[in-house]
Every structure is written in C-alpha cells, then in structure tokens.
Design a protein with these regions (language model features):
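Gly/Ala-rich beta-loop-alpha elbow adjacent to hydrolase catalytic centers
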Residues: 137-146
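Bacterial signal peptide processing site
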Residues: 15-17
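Short, surface-exposed "cap/lid" segments of acyl-processing enzymes
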Residues: 31-36, 41-92
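Conserved hydrolase catalytic core segment
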Residues: 148-159
C-alpha cells in the first residue's frame, strides 16, 4: 500500500506526494550537511540513477530569501518515483526536507554551489552508488550541481549525465536574467565530456532554452514544445528513463 509523505512532518505550506512503498527514506550525513533521500535499490548489477533536486523554494514571490528551501514543486519527485528502472534515488539538496544546524540562507542563495555544497553532494552520491555505475539526472540548479560533481571527481563512475530545465553555468544564467551574481558559488569551467542529454522547454521562463542552445551540442539537446520549467515533460519520460 502506498503511503503519504508529508515532507517528514517538519514542513508547512508544501505539497505532499504519494511515495511508492518501493522507496525508502534515508538521511545521509556528510562531513558538512545532512541530505534527504528516497531510495529504491533492487539490482546490485544495474546502474544507480540519482535524481538531484533543483534550488527549491529559495526565494518568495516578493524576491526575498526564504527560511526553508524545501521545494514546493513535486516535479522531480514525480519523475523519480515513476522511474521503472531497478535502482533509483531521489536526492534532495542540502537544507531541503531536513533540520540541520549547519544550514544558513547563503546555502540556498549566493552559495548554493559552494565548495562545501559540492563536497556534500559528492559524498552522498559516492555513498549511494557503492561502486555501481551512476546516471546523474539534475533538475534546474541540480543540473549544475551534478555537473560540478562530475567535473571535480573524474574517477566517479558516472556513465551518463541528464539535465532537465538545467542551469549549466550560473554566471551566464544570472547575466541572462539580470540577477545578482552567485558570489559564493563555484561555476563549471566547461561541460563534462561524458554521454549526456539535456531537455528543456521552449516556454521555460526560469532557464532560457536559447541560453542552453549556446552551451550544449545540438545532438545532445531536446527542446520540448510548450513545456515550462516544471510542466510538459510527460511525453519525454522515455528519454529520461533510457539506460
């Protein structure tokens, strides 16, 4: 029987979501942060597909930083929880879904891609993979974080990188939207050269598909007609779920 996850009962104002019984909640403690994850691991020989969440509820509708970055959108969780592959993990970003004394507003604003954040994600991914091959699927800011993990850890056995509505360079992204720079964050020097696929909607107002077109090879890009930042991907799930 399916169970209703109420975001660990720690949060308010967020959407609940039905989590399949095949997924188990695990809190991963790294040297810097605690990370929430939901894991389905059923085949020791298959790659582990790790979905990395976006920046979440970092700013309110007035543009001010929030006190809790846990995502209100269930977009990525829904995709992860319906992935039919045997080994699937949804990995939240630091400070999402958990109470962690280490967290500060900087961790989901100017420092959302800091070295401490990257190190924490790397430790969590290494812990989850347990020497399995890895497919990283990053959504929005999670795309850049996953790219940074790949860039800084060439020995990590990542066989494929998939991004959904992904920020691929935060300097160019903030410039494109005329936003303040993320002064406490690390940026990608160049995109990884591993097998990759980038999906983005042509109606996405958070990340411009035109910017993505400038950054990735056309053969690795799918621009989805009428898709927004968190809607319109249903007909392309098979591309995401490919091994």
């Amino acid at each position: 029987m399916k169970k209703i996850l109420l975001l660990l009962l720690l949060l308010s104002g967020c959407h609940s979501i039905v989590v399949p019984d095949s997924f188990t909640y695990k809190e991963i403690k790294t040297n810097t942060y605690k990370l929430a994850s939901w894991q389905k691991i059923t085949d020791k020989k298959s790659p582990v597909r790790i979905y990395i969440e976006g920046d979440g509820y970092a700013f309110n509708h007035l543009g001010y930083p929030t006190t809790n970055p846990t995502p209100h959108s269930t977009f990525l969780r829904e995709i992860a929880f319906t992935d039919p592959n045997p080994n699937v993990v949804y990995l939240a970003r630091p400070c999402q879904f958990v109470k962690d004394e280490r967290c500060s507003v900087k961790d989901w604003t100017t420092g959302r891609f800091s070295q401490d954040i990257i190190n924490s994600a790397t430790q969590a991914i290494t812990n989850i993979s347990n020497k399995h091959h890895i497919i990283l699927i990053g959504y929005s800011g999670g795309a850049l974080l996953s790219g940074l993990v790949i860039e800084q850890n060439p020995k990590l056995p990542v066989k494929k990188w998939i991004t959904l509505a992904g920020v691929l360079n935060h300097t160019k992204w903030t410039d494109d939207l005329n936003l303040p720079p993320l002064k406490d964050s690390v940026d990608l020097k160049k995109l990884p050269t591993i097998s990759q696929l980038h999906l983005i909607g042509d109606k996405d107002k958070t990340v411009s598909y035109k910017l993505t077109e400038k950054l990735v090879d056309n053969k690795n890009l799918i621009v989805i007609p009428k898709a927004t930042h968190d809607k319109g991907y249903t007909n392309y799930l098979s591309k995401i779920y490919e091994k």
